[in-house]
């Protein structure tokens, strides 16, 4: 409970949650979804944008710094600015993890204009995009 309160206070003050790749690896192994995570990794593949009913999503793949797991990142550029990621960039990604057999994906990497979901972000080259 105290950790949850500390994270809530950090989020309320605009501070970022520390990366926890070990938690993501555990979420992957346990087929967990709908979990707020902060990942630390390198961009290994750029994907074309995808448009859905919720907007246009910038997509790329990262490999976690502390393991062999890769994650797809889906960043809604209808809500937040595009992140100018390039292959090899080191990024910190905070959002909601969804399990899949390829490693999983992280979405909600932006603020929620309706205020119903915890805000996420992507840090790239010293700048935060949310």
Enumerate the language-model features and the residues they cover.
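Bacterial N-terminal signal peptides
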Residues: 2-11
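OB-fold and OB-like single-stranded nucleic-acid-recognition modules
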Residues: 13-130
């Amino acid at each position: 409970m105290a950790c949850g309160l500390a994270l809530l206070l950090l989020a309320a003050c605009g501070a970022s949650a520390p990366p926890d790749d070990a938690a993501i690896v555990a979420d992957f192994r346990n087929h967990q979804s709908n979990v707020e995570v902060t990942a630390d990794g390198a961009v290994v593949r750029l994907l074309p944008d995808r448009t859905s009913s919720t907007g246009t999503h910038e997509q790329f793949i990262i490999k976690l710094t502390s393991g062999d797991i890769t994650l797809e990142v889906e960043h809604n550029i209808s809500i937040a600015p595009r992140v100018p990621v390039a292959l090899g960039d080191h990024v910190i990604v905070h959002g909601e993890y969804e399990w899949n057999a390829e490693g999983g994906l992280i979405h909600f990497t932006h603020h929620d204009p309706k205020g119903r979901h915890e805000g996420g972000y992507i840090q790239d080259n010293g700048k935060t995009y949310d």
